[in-house]
Amino acid sequence: MKFRIIAAALAAGLAAATAHAEIVVGVSLGITGPGASLGVHYRNAFQLMGKTLGGEPVRFVILDDASDPTNAAKNARKLVSEEKADVLMGSNGVPSAVQMAQAAAEAKIPMLVMTPAVLSGNVLHWSFVVPQPTELMMSAVAEQLKAHGVKRVGYIGYSDTWGDLVYKAMQSLAKPYGLELVTDERYARSDTSVTGQVLRLMSTNPDAIVVGG
C-alpha cells in the first residue's frame, strides 16, 4: 500500500511539473529553391499559429531547407538536437519529407508528413502522412480524362520521388480507366527549360498531358 501511495505521489508530481511545459514543433520547409511557391505559403500559415495548443504553450521553429532533401534531413536533426523539438513537421516536397521522416525515426520522435510520401517499416511507425495517397489523388484526374474521351496520355514530371509517385499512380489507373500512357518524360526541379522533353512528348500525339510537377 505504501509503495502505491509513493508511486501515485510521484506520478502526480511529474504531471504537475510537465503540465505547462512548452511544446516545441520543429518545421522544415522549402521556403527558397524550386519548391518555394508552396513553402512560402506554408511558412506564412505557421506564422499565424496560436501560442497555445490544447491549453499548453507551443512554439513553432521554422527552418528553410531550400527545397533540398539533404538540407531537410540536416534541419530535422538540428531541430531535434538544438531546439529539442517534441514533434517534426514538413516538408513541402516529397523527397525532402522522406529524408525528414527517416531522421525522425532515428531520433524516435513523431512527425507529421505534409506530402503524400510512401513510407514503410520503422520510418512509418514514427510518421503520420497527412495528405491522401497519390493514387487516390490521381484517380480524380483519370476520371476526368475518361469523361472527356481521352485515350492516349502523355506524362511529364519531376525526376524525383514525386515524379515517380505520380507516374506509378497513373500506371495503375490506366487500364481501369481505359487510358494508355505513351510517354514518361522527366525534368529536374531546378531546370529552366523543358523544350526537349515537350517536343518528344508532342511527337507521340497524346490526347492529353499529365504533369507530375
Report residues per predicted region.
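Gram-negative bacterial Sec-dependent N-terminal signal peptides
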Residues: 1-19
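Cleaved targeting-peptide boundary
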Residues: 19-28
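Loop/turn elements at helix/coil->beta-strand transitions in domains of secreted/extracellular proteins
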Residues: 22-23, 55-59, 83-87, 106-110, ...
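Beta-alpha junction/loop-to-helix N-cap segments that form part of ligand/metal-binding clefts
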Residues: 24, 37-44, 52-119, 187-194
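Redox-cofactor binding/interface segments in oxidoreductases and associated redox assembly factors
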Residues: 27, 90, 211
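Cofactor-binding loop segments of dinucleotide-utilizing enzymes, especially the Rossmann-like FAD-
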Residues: 30, 65, 158
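Extracellular/periplasmic Venus flytrap/periplasmic-binding protein
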Residues: 74, 126-213
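Short gly/pro/ser/thr-enriched loop/turn and capping motifs at secondary-structure boundaries
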Residues: 117-122, 136
